[in-house]
């Protein structure tokens, strides 16, 4: 499908990945990738479970050989989030991964050989109802495209994507997700913009080979932030040379910055100044760690000045502003009570828990109401 303007994420074609629907709504799904050898089932499952606990919603594993492919079924049985299997050239590995219960495969159909091999993979994916992700990478574009454009360009990347899409569409396969990764931020932004104009399949966002924890976080936030701000993107991975749990943490913070994470708590904290009379930095870090696993849209403020604090964080749901020997606990900018400095963090945590429980109870009530209405209908 050729469109003339950017396809906003809410207008992309919905594609199912396990129990999740990718595209067709405002939720951008967080993805990461394991660093373990996939054939080591114990290590891989342990890492996936750590990622899921941190907020990862889809996980990808490498499948370079038959040992890895044979492990997919065992891994799948022991994890709680959808599993994507990364295949490069061997279609037989794709077939084995699909048979093992993969929720999605990442494969470029133009790279796996003769048409009958592609047909076999497409038929297996169709039979199981799983999508295929086409992964275009500026560093591995086809020779003919590099010869045409001279070097990796956004137009060349889109042409590569359309080539692989057409192979699948010609086989009447449309459960497709596409990524347009580059390590150059400007190239990635341009490629995703052009892709969003060229087709309406969901886009998986990423800046590849972005670097170490600090540099990669900055680079990914710069590139993916620009793309997200244009309404582009349905799934996202922050690629870091670090523990993959850090990728998930950065992704959550980035989505929260754009108001795209409906199930995450957010921290507001001031940059500190000479007026501060509490150890604000350590308090902010402690609170940030505490709220990292709370799946509720709560804004929490930690501020060092009792004079300006409540006013500066009027939009926060709950917060503390420290002063000498005490803190002010406030909700929605209004002071609730004074608390001693030594207990103010614990008091704040209690209030956070109350708000989280209220949110969870509201969700359960909404679910019950919806179930009742469905039964009546």
Swiss-Prot record:
Annotated EC: 1.17.7.3
Annotated residues for binding of [4Fe-4S] cluster: 270, 273, 305, 312
Database matches in NCBIfam families: ispG_gcpE, PRK00366.1
Record carries keyword Metal-binding: yes
GO molecular function annotation: 4 iron, 4 sulfur cluster binding; 4-hydroxy-3-methylbut-2-en-1-yl diphosphate synthase activity (ferredoxin); 4-hydroxy-3-methylbut-2-enyl-diphosphate synthase activity (flavodoxin); iron ion binding
Domain of life: Bacteria
Catalytic reaction(s) noted: (2E)-4-hydroxy-3-methylbut-2-enyl diphosphate + oxidized [flavodoxin] + H2O + 2 H(+) = 2-C-methyl-D-erythritol 2,4-cyclic diphosphate + reduced [flavodoxin]
GO terms of biological process kind: isopentenyl diphosphate biosynthetic process, methylerythritol 4-phosphate pathway; terpenoid biosynthetic process
Gene (name only): ispG
Pathway: Isoprenoid biosynthesis; isopentenyl diphosphate biosynthesis via DXP pathway; isopentenyl diphosphate from 1-deoxy-D-xylulose 5-phosphate: step 5/6
Listed HAMAP family: IspG
Free-text function comment from the UniProt entry: Converts 2C-methyl-D-erythritol 2,4-cyclodiphosphate (ME-2,4cPP) into 1-hydroxy-2-methyl-2-(E)-butenyl 4-diphosphate.
Name of the protein this chain belongs to: 4-hydroxy-3-methylbut-2-en-1-yl diphosphate synthase (flavodoxin)
Taxonomic source organism: Bacillus subtilis (strain 168)
